[in-house]
């Protein structure tokens, strides 16, 4: 599977995301729809963007009891999304249920990945707030291995952790990495970050880029810069 840049369309309403995407006249970028936009607009925004030719990563980070997640995934699978996710902290049983619910009668399904640790989480909060007294890379690798055991396609992680995850789970196990910023850009609320070129060198399969593209003076130029740096 080829590398790609996913634009995080973290907008509050439909008109904002459609206005943003209208600048991309020659491309149909892979886009991420998060909780804010999905909860505001519902399934209609997914259907509209699919109709316009975009691949969709639906980023809802499901984390509930296995049966609830399974039933929810049946609903999401019917939207013809291309990728979705759960929290790896929900246990192997929950992730297995998610995959089962996501799989259609013909055996096809979207890519299913698991969140290991949010890129806004650092080692200090991991230890003092979450009471996990292990190094961040060890925790992420453990969660990734659980996702692999559950039959998932990959994980969401920092670019800094892609190499270790591939070492533990194999190069075919996808790493989808937010926390990507240009070297001359602001870090924002991310703690574990890398540039697109760094992410490529570190082995990321997909990068998820939000504000460096959506808040750029020329989003199309910023997107092309990401593609050039990451895909080449």
Name the predicted role of every residue range:
Residues 3-9, 31-33, 56-60, 84-86, ...:
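Hydrophobic faces of well-ordered beta-strands that scaffold small-molecule active sites
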Residues 79-92, 189-222:
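Glycine-rich phosphate-binding active-site loops on the catalytic face of alpha/beta enzymes
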Residues 26, 52, 79, 150, ...:
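Structural motif
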Residues 2, 68-72, 77-153, 161, ...:
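Conserved anion-binding
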Residues 14-16, 37-52, 64-71, 88-111, ...:
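Active-site-adjacent beta->alpha loops and helix N-cap segments on the catalytic face
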Residues 12-24, 67-75, 134-146, 191-198:
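Short, acidic/polar
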Residues 1-20, 162-170, 187, 194, ...:
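N-terminal amphipathic alpha-helix/helix-capping segment at the start of soluble metabolic enzymes
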């Amino acid at each position: 599977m080829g590398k790609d840049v996913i634009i995080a369309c973290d907008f509050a309403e439909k008109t904002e995301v459609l206005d943003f995407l209208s600048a991309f006249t020659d491309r149909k970028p892979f886009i991420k729809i998060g909780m804010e936009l999905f909860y505001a607009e519902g399934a209609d925004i997914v259907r509209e963007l699919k109709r316009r030719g975009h691949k969709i990563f639906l980023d809802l980070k499901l984390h509930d009891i296995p049966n609830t997640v399974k039933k929810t995934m049946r609903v999401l699978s019917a939207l013809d999304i291309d990728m979705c996710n759960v929290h790896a902290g929900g246990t192997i049983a929950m992730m297995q249920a998610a995959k089962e619910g996501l799989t259609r009668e013909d055996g096809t399904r979207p890519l299913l990945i698991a969140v290991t640790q949010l890129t806004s989480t650092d080692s200090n909060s991991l230890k003092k707030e979450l009471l996990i007294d292990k190094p961040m890379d060890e925790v992420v690798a453990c969660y990734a291995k659980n996702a692999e055991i559950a039959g998932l396609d990959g994980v969401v992680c920092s670019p800094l952790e892609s190499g270790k995850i591939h070492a533990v789970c194999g190069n075919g196990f996808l790493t989808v990495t937010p926390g990507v910023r240009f070297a001359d850009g602001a870090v924002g609320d991310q703690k574990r970050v890398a540039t697109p070129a760094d992410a490529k060198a570190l082995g990321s399969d997909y990068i998820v880029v939000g504000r460096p593209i959506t808040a750029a003076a020329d989003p199309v130029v910023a997107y092309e810069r990401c593609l050039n740096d990451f895909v080449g």
